[in-house]
Amino acid sequence: MDIQRAKEEIKRAVQAYLATDDIGRPLIPAVRQRPILLMGPPGVGKTQIMEQIAQECDIALVAYTITHHTRQSAVGLPFIRERNYGGHTRSVTEYTMSEIIASVYAAMERTGKKNGILFIDEINCVSETLAPTMLQFLQCKTFGNQAVPGGWVIVAAGNPPEYNKSVREFDLVTLDRVRRIDIEPKLSVWQDYARAHRLHPAVTAYLELRPQHFYKIENDVDGVQFVTARGWEDLSAYLQAADCLLYTSPSPR
């Protein structure tokens, strides 16, 4: 589906997950609230729609690109603690709070909002050491031994294998515990976005004439050549800045 339809689907899911009955119980029990898994090419707008959904639902948002993190920052740092088991003192390994879980609590304190979205990007592109942690996160909604707080909806995003060589395929057990939404770029949807955000007319006019250039990734002798929706928006910002500088530059003497 296109990015606009995906946004609507996710927004409805978030609203359903956070809805409660007259005595405050979730209409959908937490165990039935499947994490949402977005799969789509880079630069299509996955992170942007999460920001929009959080704003429209008046909830908090914590977003992480997981490839920027290590196992220690995701799970926490280990430390040794003495425990008594069966009358014997034993040294056991425990962990500090996950940096990601700590960020959720910090967002709740900062915004005053108890509900939110925890968005993990590039979840299927993690290193080998972090991959089991991500599987546990999707299956159990935990990082290490710490659960994601109640009232927080988990949304993850990844890239299909054709766009990223480091992609790791999820097994059937994991896929059976998530709600997967596949996203494809669609020019007409992006054009609506471009008009609403007043992107540079040179960009929109060019894509009217060359729609086949909107989203393209190919390999040639020089390596991977690509253009994405994000790239067109960045170009628009550059052109608008150039226009502003041109109009405000002093005239030559």
List the predicted regions and their residue ranges.
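Conserved AAA+ ATPase small/helical "lid" subdomain
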Residues: 198-246
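Active-site catalytic microenvironments for nucleophilic, acid-base chemistry
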Residues: 56, 140, 238-241, 251
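A generic secondary-structure signal
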Residues: 12-16, 238, 248
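Conserved small/polar residues in nucleotide/adenosyl-binding loops
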Residues: 247-253
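AAA+ P-loop NTPase catalytic core and its hallmark functional loops
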Residues: 2-207
